[in-house]
Design a protein with these regions (language model features):
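C-terminal motif of bacterial Sec signal peptides marking the signal peptidase cleavage site
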Residues: 15-19
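Extended ligand-binding regions for polar small-molecule ligands
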Residues: 21, 63-64, 68-73, 135, ...
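Ligand-binding clefts/hinges and TM-proximal coupling segments of bilobed small-molecule sensing domains
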Residues: 22-25, 76-79, 156-176, 215-217, ...
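Extracytoplasmic small-molecule ligand-binding "clamshell" domains
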Residues: 30-103
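Periplasmic-binding protein-like
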Residues: 43-44, 122-130, 200, 208-247, ...
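Bilobed "Venus flytrap"/periplasmic-binding protein-like clamshell domains
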Residues: 45-47, 58-72, 127-181, 200-202
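Acidic, polar ligand-binding/catalytic clefts
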Residues: 79-143, 215
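A ligand-binding cleft/hinge motif common to bilobed small-molecule-binding domains
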Residues: 87, 102-112, 160-163, 187-223
Length: 270
């Protein structure tokens, strides 16, 4: 399997990825003075899921979901620790954070290292994304023969593409990185890569944010949901409380409202 890491010289027009790998903290709510602090790993440049707003405060769909859970759990107070996607997983594994909210889908490698929450909070159906002005719209992995495909390191999108390539060696070339949204879009529109993998609402966000016309294939190449993720040493009573709170927030329509606010549609799993 071909494996490429794009460096700065390859994409000279891209911005330097600020804050990548670094962390910053923000408290979800004040909570009771004797409440147990839970550090929550998330993103700081991952619109529309987790990012720092113009005031330096954490915002986004995943952040809002966690804040809603925190409001229901009076015995706990949540503090956000921002980083890129793979660093957040490393922070969770080392117990620097006890919980992570970063659109984590289920895969076997993570199941060995972490504990997944029981309640899915967003549909994550993955499509092949491309720029029709620069090439072709791709409906399936078979259509990507001989192409370059960007995936973020340690994501489920990387894992699913790797699984396909394990059975179809050299079908296409994977390009790995930890790009922010702007860098991913520029990689696709500049022709540095031919395609990437993402859900439909992420592509809508890219097009709206950067005035682009990226398109998705006619069908998803993978269907799944995203879940909260916990360190294996995290207290089970806390995990159970989070699961219960999230189920209640789905039942009362709160999660649907947040999905419509941040994702421009109802992407809440059944």
């Amino acid at each position: 399997m071909k494996r490429t890491i794009l460096g700065a010289s390859t994409l000279v027009t891209l911005l330097v990825l600020g804050a990548c790998g670094s962390s910053s903290a923000d408290t979800a709510s004040s909570g009771a003075s004797d409440a147990t602090e839970i550090k929550v790993g998330t993103g700081n440049e991952a619109l529309p899921y987790a990012y720092l707003d113009e005031n330096g405060e954490y915002d986004g769909y995943d952040v809002a979901v966690v804040k809603a859970i925190d409001e229901k759990l009076l015995d706990y107070t949540f503090t956000f620790e921002g980083a890129d996607f793979p660093t957040t997983l490393s922070n969770l594994e080392s117990n620097k954070v006890q919980m992570a909210a970063y659109e984590y889908e289920v895969n076997d490698e993570r199941k060995e290292k972490f504990v997944y929450g029981d309640v899915g909070y967003v549909v994550w159906d993955t499509y092949i994304v491309s720029d029709p002005d620069a090439g072709t719209v791709y409906d399936s992995f078979e259509d990507l023969a001989g192409k370059k495909v960007y995936v973020t390191t340690a994501t489920n999108q990387a894992a699913m593409a790797e699984a396909y390539l394990a059975e179809n060696p050299d079908a296409f070339e994977l390009v790995y990185g930890e790009y922010n949204n702007e860098q991913i879009v520029q990689a696709v529109t500049s022709g540095a890569v031919d395609a990437t993998l993402a859900p439909e609402y992420q592509v809508d966000n890219w097009n709206n944010s950067f005035s682009e016309n990226l398109e998705i294939g006619s069908e998803p190449v993978h269907n799944s949901n995203a879940y909260l993720l916990f360190n294996k040493e995290t207290d089970q009573d806390f995990i159970d409380a989070v699961n219960t709170a999230l189920e209640e927030l789905k039942a009362d329509g709160t999660i649907k409202e947040l999905s419509e606010k941040y994702l421009d549609g109802d992407y809440v799993p059944e």
